[in-house]
Amino acid sequence: MVLLRGVGLLRSSNVTSGGAAATASRGGNLFKCLMNAKRPDGMLVNRRGFHGSMVYKAAMSEEEASELSDVTKQLTGADLQAASKLRNIGISAHIDSGKTTFTERVLYYTGRIKAIHEVRGRDNVGAKMDSMDLEREKGITIQSAATYCSWNKDQKDYHFNLIDTPGHIDFTIEVERALRVLDGAVLIVCAVSGVQSQTVTVDRQMRRYNVPRITFINKMDRMGSNPFKAIEQINSKLQISAAALQVPIGSESNLRGVVDIINRVAYYNKGDQGEIIDKAEVPEDLKDLVEEKRALLIEKLADVDDEIAELFLEEQEPTVEQIKSAIRRATIARKFTPVMMGTALGNTGIQHVLDAIVDYLPNPSEVLNTGLDLSKNEAKVPLVPSIQQPFVGLAFKLEEGKYGQLTYIRVYQGRLRKGNYITNIKTGKKVKVSRLVRMHSEEMEDVDEIGSGEICATFGIDCSSGDTFTDGNVKYSMSSMYVPDAVVSLSIKPKSKDSTNFSKAFNRFQKEDPTFRVKFDPESKETVISGMGELHLEIYVERMKREYNVECETGKPQVSYRESITIPAEFDYTHKKQSGGAGQFGRVIGTMSPVEGETRDNLFETAIVGGRIPDKYLAACGKGFEEACEKGPLVGHKVLGVKMLINDGAIHAVDSNELSFKTATMAAFRDAFLKSQPVVLEPIMNVSVTSPNEFQGNVIGLLNKLQAVIQDTENGHDEFTVKAECSLSTMFGFATSLRASTQGKGEFSLEFSHYAPTPPHVQKELMAEYAKKQKK
């Protein structure tokens, strides 16, 4: 069976239950006991909502834990010592939740930068990690930026490789890239808005790449902030057990510090930039709240950790060390996320997050990374983060720098040395590592060697994003990143006739960003670019102007439609062509039917009995099917969710060849497709709009005008969020309409949800337009 690409497949996540629930199944009536257990403070707790019974899709499986244990046994004391001081982490969140502001404080407190600059600061310097001019102007992160810094905790220096990622859905590939190579992440959630649409997307990406996370609730100094409501949403909407490790001292504009509920200590950030931390006793008016939240934390840990569950049953209060160890185990096993709180802009609570990164996020030796051994039929092999092992690294990001192409590499195994030769597994080419650097946003620091588990960059290596490199001693390949389909296209042409830089820019952008696609449409004689949204394409058009001095004219944004069928149909097609000499002959018989299911990939199958069509011709039929799926007969867009089965046919002893059967299959495909009640599918988007409460009527009216289906509305203290499903074709220009309806105070995010049939009148119009183009 040949599986042809339709909509990208998501990697399935591991499924397991919480630790205490597992203990319950072993201990007979233990679960009943826990249902009415006592809290450490003596209060009886009704346990109907016992979280251990919940299924955490991303939790570590027993098989994964066993493989990881085998890998750890292969590490030397020196390997474990080196790994214990290293953390590879990403900063992820919904747009405007304060990721870059948070990262700026991290760099300042770790001594990496000398002064703090704001994302939209008056000094016009911009945040360190927003190195592109466009990022500083728009106040958003477009590319993920890498840096490294050191943090001293308990008289030990820890080395952080840190990646700040975009929050805008149009740049989601940057988040995918970062999470693919990171061992842990800090998820930032707004204390006012709570879990938002892109928070859910980032959570899904973290699960896809098995990334444990700690959570920081930011913007605690804003009016309407409610960290405990945000924690409830993390539990309910993200379906992962979460509990606070802190409670705030004061609220909103009176926020003065936080209380560490594990150690029962109050911390106040002092100094001009919050760099001085004063330690004090817990304020009297917060003592009850601290005990309540501490009991809740232990209760949550009992759901996901066996050791705490045992203590919980015995009505013993765990020690500080036992609580911290349990948080670490549960976080690394992806069953739990510890929650801290503060305000990045107000310089409160950031240092505690740095401590939590050390305490609770895994080092490279505590994460299972696997490759595929191409010399053993792609057998899965665990990668060992030891410098004694053969080198294996993944090129996860490309950038065009002033010294040529800059390739970011995560070293999974072995070490990478300047001057060494490494092999690109995809192309088989050997390349020399002439320069090796550590990145600090757009600045770089030269190094001679990079060890296992580290992230670096190198120059002069010709490769694509997602390529695997080894030292040539092993033929391992890393599984590639998930790349979503493009949903928006527009035609583009340079204003001047000189198109050298025009082509050069496209080649570079496509190498850098797999979600940015360029093709030439032979019918309209136009160059068409496709991407994840209007902003995504707008940024690339602007970058062409700035970086390549090419001004462009663009057409109207076009929707990437799909074509599909609704009922099965049979086909029997004979392709004959004779014009003297060798002719062409191929006959194919079979059925075409719709494919059900979430992914709706196109499938090509054969069931030929008695060799009526030889295998080499069947392979040509497969190619014909793949080619036919690239351009449907209704409106010329890709085909989705079609299964073609060839179960009979005929050949001619002289005239049959691969081309004949490829042509016959394409013609049979077209005939059967048109008989199968075909439909044009359009992208349906998840829309999330946030705006001040006084504009609620305007926003709902605007969405109704677009025939959006409203799914949910949440009213906050001073703003509301409405979630809806809407056809992408109606969303062009929505940003302008929303600005006008909310006096510029509304914001929205769009994310692809699924494909659905267009209304009949729209399908008619699209088909008529396509037929008109064909005649020209």
UniProtKB/Swiss-Prot annotation:
GO terms for molecular function: GTP binding; GTPase activity; translation elongation factor activity. Residues 1-57 form a transit peptide. GTP binds at residues 93-100, 164-168, 218-221. Its main location: mitochondrion. Pathway: Protein biosynthesis; polypeptide chain elongation. The keyword Transcription does not apply. It is found in: Mitochondrion. One of its GO terms (cellular component) is mitochondrion. Residues 84-365 form the tr-type G domain. GO terms for biological process: mitochondrial translational elongation. Keywords: Elongation factor, GTP-binding, Mitochondrion, Nucleotide-binding, Protein biosynthesis, Transit peptide. Belongs to the TRAFAC class translation factor GTPase superfamily. Classic translation factor GTPase family. EF-G/EF-2 subfamily. This is Elongation factor G, mitochondrial.
